[in-house]
């Protein structure tokens, strides 16, 4: 028997569900691609990127055969670049396997695929009765059932995962998962939820106890760190110097001009011009402040061995962090 909560959401979804292109297929590749893109990305922006990826890489084999630079370049502007690297690695895994994994366990073995993404793919593509638990699901369940356990605690994750699975109608897993996510995204929103026209308001514990704005509960966030960056864009006879960022730090694998951090700028031959100062750029756990300089010289300065010189006109072939993209807009030929 389907739980009354699930039945109400399915009825609501039949009338109010979002029409998204990846919902018109059971092919796991476009579904997986959409789930990865939509992590930390609004649907309005993510939809455009999904179309670009599907056009450039219509199958998982096409994606697997691409270079990492090509994938990062197409991803540019979405942020959280580890998603793109994991996507590319997982595509190679799938190609090596010969086909997309068809079980929840098999899908979880793919690089970068966690519990939520695996459950989404398993239910949407293969009809497996695997409940999704994302931010929308946490919010809907915590409010409706009046659960105050912090959603980012170990106890909370277990409690909500168990409840989500208990409520899931096995024969309609895909529709229900989409329903509860859409309900959280458009109806039971973080701020100003539409409680006055909610189809399950009569049984909502948070509404009846005036706790809607207090749920879900989260543990205190991590401390935000501040970094001050000085970038020097070196231009010599139509060429510029860039390097690939190393592993273990932000923007791994992307390209950047000369970075000087926590040190004064050394003397250079040529003309050094400050173009932008204290440009603020916010990441998840960091706030960056960047100064951007242009160094124009007639001879190439000595740089660390990881730097390469490229024609300035070729810069758009390299995947850059969004901050560097913004800073290079200050340049004139």
Outline where the language-model segments fall:
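Intrinsically disordered, low-complexity, charged terminal extensions of DNA damage-control enzymes
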Residues: 1-18, 24, 185-333
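Catalytic cores of DNA base-excision repair glycosylases
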Residues: 3-8, 12-194, 200-213
């Amino acid at each position: 028997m389907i739980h009354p909560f699930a039945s109400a959401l399915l009825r609501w979804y039949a009338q109010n569900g979002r029409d998204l292109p990846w919902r018109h297929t059971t092919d796991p590749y476009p579904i997986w691609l959409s789930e990865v893109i939509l992590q930390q990305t609004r649907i309005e922006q993510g939809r455009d990127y999904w179309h670009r990826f599907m056009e450039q890489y219509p199958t998982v084999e096409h994606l697997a055969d691409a270079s990492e630079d090509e994938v990062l370049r197409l991803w540019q502007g979405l942020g959280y670049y580890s998603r793109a690297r994991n996507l590319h690695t997982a595509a190679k895994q799938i190609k090596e396997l010969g086909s997309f994994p068809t079980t929840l366990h098999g899908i979880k073995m793919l690089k970068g695929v966690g519990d939520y993404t695996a459950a989404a793919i398993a239910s949407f593509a293969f009809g497996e009765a695997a409940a999704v638990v994302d931010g929308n699901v946490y919010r809907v369940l915590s409010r409706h059932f009046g659960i105050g356990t912090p959603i980012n605690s170990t106890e909370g994750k277990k409690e909500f995962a168990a409840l989500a699975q208990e409520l899931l109608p096995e024969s309609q897993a895909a529709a229900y998962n989409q329903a509860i996510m859409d309900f959280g995204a458009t109806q039971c929103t973080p701020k100003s939820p539409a409680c006055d026209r909610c189809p399950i308001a009569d049984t909502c514990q948070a509404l009846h106890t005036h706790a809607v704005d207090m749920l879900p509960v989260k543990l205190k966030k991590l401390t935000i760190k501040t970094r001050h960056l000085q970038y020097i864009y070196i231009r010599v006879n139509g060429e510029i110097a860039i390097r690939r960022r190393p592993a273990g730090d932000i923007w791994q694998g992307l390209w950047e001009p000369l970075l000087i951090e926590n040190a004064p700028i050394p003397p250079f031959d040529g003309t050094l011009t400050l173009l932008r100062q204290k440009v603020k750029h916010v990441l998840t756990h960091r706030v960056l402040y960047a100064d951007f300089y242009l160094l124009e010289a007639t001879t190439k300065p000595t740089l660390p061995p990881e730097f390469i010189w490229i024609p300035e006109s070729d810069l758009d072939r390299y995947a850059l962090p969004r901050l560097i993209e913004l800073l290079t807009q200050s340049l004139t030929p």
